Amino acid sequence: MLKKLTKIKTEVYALGQHISMSAHKARRVVDQIRGRSYEETLMILELMPYRACYPILKLVYSAAANANYNMDSNESNLVISKAEVSEGTATKKLKPRARGRSFTIKRPTCHIAIVVKDISLDEYQYLGVDFIDSFRCSKKLQSKKKYTAMSYHDMYTNGGIWDKK
């Protein structure tokens, strides 16, 4: 049996486009959650008093749901590996002014991408190849190695229980 080392997918993303908010204001919030665990991120976003927190919270929920559906991963093993904010197009509206004139109002938009990584999965796994005859070969995928007892750093160990939606 030959064994071949292959790279598996351990990251899942959620993308929010044309969110009506300044990219600078969204970056202030995104910089606080980058590199943190999923549960810690939920606590931070629910307690921060900024308007940018709600769309980012929805994207974090969506990325966790994508990881659960695509990789069958547990929420306690998820970490925000990448989070980036880029500027979108500015929507233009007209504001009526005196004497029949009008001024343009530019509303900035931004695109937010949240990438979630499962720390319990190995990045590489072996593919076993059985040669049945010289013309056909079948590949068997070994099961994913999951470490369920692995826990990420816990910032709040005072026993506070937070509601996870």
Swiss-Prot record:
Pfam families: Ribosomal_L22 (PF00237). One of its GO terms (cellular component) is chloroplast. InterPro entries: Ribosomal_uL22, Ribosomal_uL22_bac/chlpt-type, Ribosomal_uL22_bac/org-type, Ribosomal_uL22_sf. GO terms for biological process: translation. Keywords: Chloroplast, Plastid, Ribonucleoprotein, Ribosomal protein, RNA-binding, rRNA-binding. One of its GO terms (molecular function) is rRNA binding. It comes from the Eukaryota. It is found in: Plastid, Chloroplast. This protein binds specifically to 23S rRNA. Belongs to the universal ribosomal protein uL22 family. Part of the 50S ribosomal subunit. This is Large ribosomal subunit protein uL22c. The gene is rpl22.
